[in-house]
Amino acid sequence: MRVNLLIAMIIFALIWPATALRAAVSKTTWADAPAREFVFVENNSDDNFFVTPGGALDPRLTGANRWTGLKYNGSGTIYQQSLGYIDNGYNTGLYTNWKFDMWLENSPVSSPLTGLRCINWYAGCNMTTSLILPQTTDASGFYGATVTSGGAKWMHGMLSDAFYQYLQQMPVGSSFTMTINACQTSVNYDANSGARCKDQASGNWYVRNVTHTKAANLRLINTHSLAEVFINSDGVPTLGEGNADCRTQTIGSRSGLSCKMVNYTLQTNGLSNTSIHIFPAIANSSLASAVGAYDMQFSLNGSSWKPVSNTAYYYTFNEMKSADSIYVFFSSNFFKQMVNLGISDINTKDLFNFRFQNTTSPESGWYEFSTSNTLIIKPRDFSISIISDEYTQTPSREGYVGSGESALDFGYIVTTSGKTAADEVLIKVTGPAQVIGGRSYCVFSSDDGKAKVPFPATLSFITRNGATKTYDAGCDDSWRDMTDALWLTTPWTDISGEVGQMDKTTVKFSIPMDNAISLRTVDDNGWFGEVSASGEIHVQATWRNIN
């Protein structure tokens, strides 16, 4: 017995010093987090994504992958103050000047995180990015982010675009589980050399499994639909060209114009949620102050309406489940106040947007999205407009270069409105251009910019004597006269009794695909592949001697 005891004591004596000399981070493995549901917003109007809790906030999976017009920049109301991020549900604080790693096991995507998320206006955060960059990242996470001094920072990892793309393709009702590792240490290790927080002599390492279920997918559809609205001095609207779903309407004592402004699809797994609110907001503060709450109203069905008044009136997620559109009503007084404030020739996407607020997540629950359709609002007295005859903001064409190939043709409708016909109407084409042999050509380029190919271009219209007039346009930014076009005239009478007229004509912009010069680049080299270009067509009108 004494021998055995002595041996045990010797073994203990040999082992104990080795154990006493070994130090490590303190590892805590938390119990699995309760599964959480999220709502994913796929914004095709603005080309970005947003994810927000369908129920409880923690563990967090919340925020947008891009800044919106609600981004806080240091003054005014604080709305969107960080981009999207995750955590393990404990919202653990970080120590100043310590280093922080976050990595995922069983990650749904490669390279899921970009760095340490922070609130952009807090001291030590980046106002532009809401991100503290790590020393390095890999397929699992990020490493060596130094916790800056100033405002509070937490164990939050900012989501990569790859993570959002994974959430986008998930079927509604499906789930994923991942293990979140979060580690902080006071040791100043070099993550670029492969060192990691979990291997240091001190620190805190937390491990937790989290599960998220996609409870809903809200897809905002960009219809590219376009319509013109002409308003007189009293704010009375007149619909011009276009295919947006608009009609004159009277709501209570207010007359005006209502239009379907948002198209969406909403798939759910049966989620019930009332913390998600959606409502429009006027972007121009002067106009917002000048109009009354009922001068702008919104509806899910075009018949029952709510006034626009900051966050006071909204539709909830549950209410949106029974619809697929949002309508907006503009009263004549709304338009009249625009006239009084000198707001004209404006696109509705610059006039107002829709806001998305999830009251469950105050730091990252704000989001903004543009309308699906666009209204071009112009004064009826002395204005000119040009829109695609397809009633879309960005018409496009594609084709092949070679003998017998068809031209790329774009049709447009030009409208003038005034007390009389315009004395002069001019048109021009702008875009990448180069003069070759004394003639201007539109220049199309390959994605890498190495191939630049010249294309001729023309503007043509029917004149009042029935002939076709054609200009060599070449993207040269030079005005051409189209006053002698064949105009279709519609008289109008203002509410004051003043008379005027609206004149319309059509014009075609054409890019031939069969010109031999387009078989070679501007450097006279052969080329093969794809080239592209974009440009603009501008019009202007002049009225003289108007009393």
UniProtKB/Swiss-Prot annotation:
UniProt signal peptide: 1-20
What is this protein's function?
A: Part of the ecpRABCDE operon, which encodes the E.coli common pilus (ECP). ECP is found in both commensal and pathogenic strains and plays a dual role in early-stage biofilm development and host cell recognition. Tip pilus adhesin, which is required for assembly of EcpA into fibers.
Q: What is this protein called?
A: Fimbria adhesin EcpD
Where's it found, cell-wise?
Fimbrium
Q: What is its main location?
A: other
The UniProt subunit note reads as follows:
Forms polymers. Interacts with EcpA.
Alphabetically sorted, this entry's keywords are: Fimbrium, Signal
A GO term from the CC aspect: pilus
**Which family is this sequence assigned to?**
Belongs to the EcpD/MatE family.
Q: What happens when the gene is disrupted?
A: Mutants do not express ECP and are defective in biofilm formation.
Q: What induces it?
A: Negatively regulated by H-NS. Positively regulated by IHF and EcpR.
